[in-house]
């Protein structure tokens, strides 16, 4: 509930930016949180990254306006990447487990994508080229792979 409240608060504030977070050198498990505010506030870009565990990596690139990206990682050796261009796009990646790999690429207008991985060794990729597309991938086992492309 606390994370959802924080997410909503930052969304309303419209924290802009591009964010990258890694936690390679933590001696113990901690919560690593990053919000970056590098671009103009008029773009209304938000990148929120939360990490618990070790050796997790998250990368977000945003070009456009009204973009929101949320990445949550718990475990070890998880990789997440979001690449957003265009306007009014939303991307969400949640990883629980180890050695999961997820990426979302969005362009155009009004797209929503979510990847939820619970297990180990999963791979998922969502690419959205069109307008007003929605895609959700849920992987609850280990060593699963999927690629979704929407035009």
Curated annotation (Swiss-Prot):
Signal sequence annotation: 1-21
Subcellular location: Fimbrium
GO cellular component: pilus
UniProt keyword Protein biosynthesis, yes or no: no
GO biological process: cell adhesion
Record key words, sorted: Fimbrium, Signal
Domain of life per record: Bacteria
Family matches, as Pfam families: Curlin_rpt (PF07012)
Principal subcellular localisation of the protein: other
Keyword Transcription: no
Stated family: Belongs to the CsgA/CsgB family.
NCBIfam families membership: PRK10101.1
Job description of the protein: Curlin is the structural subunit of the curli. Curli are coiled surface structures that assemble preferentially at growth temperatures below 37 degrees Celsius. Curli can bind to fibronectin. The minor subunit is the nucleation component of curlin monomers.
Protein name, entry field: Minor curlin subunit
Species, as recorded: Salmonella typhi
Gene: csgB
């Amino acid at each position: 509930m606390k994370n959802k409240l924080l997410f909503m608060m930052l969304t309303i504030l419209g924290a802009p930016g591009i964010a990258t977070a890694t936690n390679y050198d933590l001696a113990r498990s901690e919560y690593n949180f990053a919000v970056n505010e590098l671009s103009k506030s008029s773009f209304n870009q938000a990148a929120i990254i939360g990490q618990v565990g070790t050796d997790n990596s998250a990368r977000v690139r945003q070009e456009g306006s009204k973009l929101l990206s949320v990445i949550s990682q718990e475990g070890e050796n998880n990789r997440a990447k979001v690449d957003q261009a265009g306007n009014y796009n939303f991307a969400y990646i949640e990883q629980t487990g180890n050695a999961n790999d997820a990426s979302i690429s969005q362009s155009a207008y009004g797209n929503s994508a979510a990847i939820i991985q619970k297990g180990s060794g999963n791979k998922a990729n969502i690419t959205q080229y069109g307008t007003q597309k929605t895609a959700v991938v849920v992987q609850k086992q280990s060593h699963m792979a999927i690629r979704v492309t929407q035009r």
